[in-house]
Amino acid sequence: MSLRDCQAWKNAGLPLSTTSNEACKLFDATLTQYVKWTNDKSLGGIEGCLSKLRAADPTFAMGLAISNGLVLVGTGTSVALDKDLALAVKTMVELSQTQTLTPREQLHVSAVEMFAKGNFPRACDLWEQILRDHPTDMLALKFSHDAYFYLGYQEQMRDSVARVYPFWTPDIPLNSYVKGIYSFGLMETNFYDQAQKLAKEALSIEPTDAWSVHTVAHVHEMRAEIKDGLEFMQQSEGHWKDSDMLACHNYWHWALYLIEKGDYEAALTIYDSHILPSLQASGTMLDVVDSCSMLYRLQMEGVPLGQRWQTVLPVTQKHTRDHILLFNDAHFLMASLGARDLQTTRELLTTLQEASKSPGENCQHQLAKDVGLPLCQALLEAENGNPDRVLELLLPIRYRIVQIGGSNAQRDVFNQLLIHAAMTCTSSVHKNVARSLLMERDALKPNSPLTERLIRRAAAVHLMQ
């Protein structure tokens, strides 16, 4: 892989304010691994590259922006929780004010600063400003893509890439990966055919592109194409299993097909062999939510989980007071409820309530009162056997849950929760809710074995008449 030096970045119309060729190449190496979702051992992994990058030029603004940005976009910590990170962001901003940076670099620094404050929409505006003038700025494209994902801004996630896609000609490094990034936004906005076509194009150029594999997995999931999905994951596994940052999530998609089929043993085997080990090795947020989401789905299906929640709890417990993403919070709560840890549950809910009272410019804390807290409360009520209360909490906000971010497939766990609650509620006010929700689900995703199972169960207790 030929990494770009100072001159190469300049030639690309993306000059970097450093005289160190080494720093420029390490910036490229870090960016490449981020885009590929893979820590490349031959490059020393992202961590290795970042520490060498800091050594090569400690005041390199774009080096600091990618370094701080990656930590923040990981959503495993924040400036409120980590003093070193807070200092690193502050130092980055101060250094940028003493240097003569290009307007593009200055915007990058400001965007990371905004993201650090929890103001994701403003950060995205700044990244978009960069992309208008520099459509091949991959860092702005990827950071904004991730932030839109956290915001549940699905159209923006798609259109952000549509606006720059024509500029990514085959001679530009990483150009095929832009197809995969674009395909994901298309898929999340229900352009399934177009999404699949682009993802397959990307895979024909670079078969190890785990994010494009991930788009195809989503398309099969959303269309309930279980057989095709399973075949695709089996055939492509050799290509994506070494993408250490996304392999666990692709295995999660594989397991979703098995849960859909009702093949719970096979799903648990994937959980035990791939998802849990990945969680224990990395502790990254994506691996955490994959574990919690999968166990919760199996639990709703009545599958005995043994001590699996207790194994996840030590990882989620550390993040009880984080409140970085409401989507993450809801999944941490699943773990403390599943492990019957009342103290952690209470702590998560009380500290989230506190955060919602003085949100400042933090978009997640602003959303906590109307969406995050009712959603978390609904999980608690479900655990306490109060299905009517679950419906009272979730029905008014069900079309707002998208605002907590995540994908349609990931948030489907909350649709399933609502249906399960509706099937066991006793209030006459709610008597036809289960039927309505099941009809809607069947219309949107026909031939889903999971939906068919739920309809059979509902019909057996006369809820479908």
UniProtKB/Swiss-Prot annotation:
**In residue terms, where are the TPR repeats?**
104-137, 176-209, 248-281
| Protein origin, superkingdom | Eukaryota
Quote the InterPro entries the UniProt record gives.
TPR-like_helical_dom_sf, TTC38
The residue range of the signal peptide is none
The record's keywords, sorted A to Z, are: Repeat, TPR repeat
Keyword Nucleotide-binding annotated: no
What protein family does this chain belong to? Belongs to the TTC38 family.
In Swiss-Prot or TrEMBL terms, this protein is called Tetratricopeptide repeat protein 38
Q: What is the lineage of its organism?
A: Eukaryota, Metazoa, Chordata, Craniata, Vertebrata
